[in-house]
Amino acid sequence: MFVTRLAGATLVLATLGGCTTVTSAQAPADIAIEGSRVHPESITSDGAGNIYVSSVGGTIYRALAGSRKAEPWIRPDAANGLTSLFGVLADDAHGVLWACNNPPFDGPAPAGATSGVKTFDLATGAFKASFDFPAGPAACNDIAVAADGTAFVTDTAGGRIFSLTPGASELALFAADPALVGIDGIAFSGDGTMYINNVRQHTVQRVDRNGAAYAGLTTLALSEPINGPDALRPVSGNRFLQAEGPGNRVTYVDIKGDNAVITAVKTGLDSSPGVTHVGRIGYATEGKINYLFDPALRDKDPGPFIIRAFLLP
């Protein structure tokens, strides 16, 4: 978005293909996003190294492995109902691309536009299904998937986490808590623990559970402040990549117990809501959101939109 232990069965985040390796001798190449006024949001990658990017206009862009251009791949149409996108997640294990869809925030909403999660075939881009959030304030933000195929979806405005089991026809409420208002990124560690961040509270938290039920949050003590945390993506073990939109940077988040060490790995970005990695190469989106909200910039040309590539330490 611009601007606690989970016990029981072991959960594995089906996301961010890290199977493709990149040697340190290779210079990371930025990727240009085709089009104007794209304003990308989330970014994800599959095991083959293909990269997928969401946008405020509802188009999903794809850059094939090794390409320096991301092209429109899934466009809004009457069948898929795409309007404006936040989180996207490549789920290799189940052959699904997940996408958080919302009514446009920079103009009137089309009739019937709702917040919810949509699924597409990861290989072909064919639309599969839509799962709308219940009525009320809502903003679908990001997704993580368990080893059994159950998806967990964050709702920033409503302070909720929904789940969707394989074969289900509608979302189930996993958690609702005033403390969850502002929830943004979601990811699992190597041992199946669920972590989230909160874009409004500037926190990283562990989700606690009593059996199958949500049991609250543990706010981690951070080694330094963070500013508007957004995407949260697993690397390995208890290490994550985190994008900070207002902070204009990407960091490592290394968790040990109730503490987390924050280490900057890429700075100087232009409002960076999304991050993924392919092997040792990180990729971050630049949303350039000032061109959406600043009256002095709204009619100005934001220039090209670039996915920034950088070597991970």
Task: Give the role of each language-model region.
Residues 27-33, 69-79, 126-133, 170-177, ...:
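A short beta-strand motif characteristic of beta-propeller blades
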Residues 34-50, 79-101, 133-151, 177-194, ...:
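Beta-rich, blade/repeat-based domains predominating
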Residues 51-57, 91, 97-112, 145, ...:
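Conserved beta-strand positions in repeat-built beta-propeller and related beta-rich domains
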Residues 59-61, 115-118, 160-163, 203-205, ...:
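A short loop-to-beta-strand structural motif that recurs across blades of beta-propeller domains
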Residues 64-68, 121-126, 165-169, 208-213, ...:
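Short loop/turn segments that connect beta-strands within beta-propeller blades
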Residues 111-148:
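Asp-box/WD-like beta-propeller blade repeats and closely related beta-sheet repeat scaffolds
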Residues 276-313:
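Blade-level signature of beta-propeller repeat domains, shared across WD40, Kelch, NHL, RCC1
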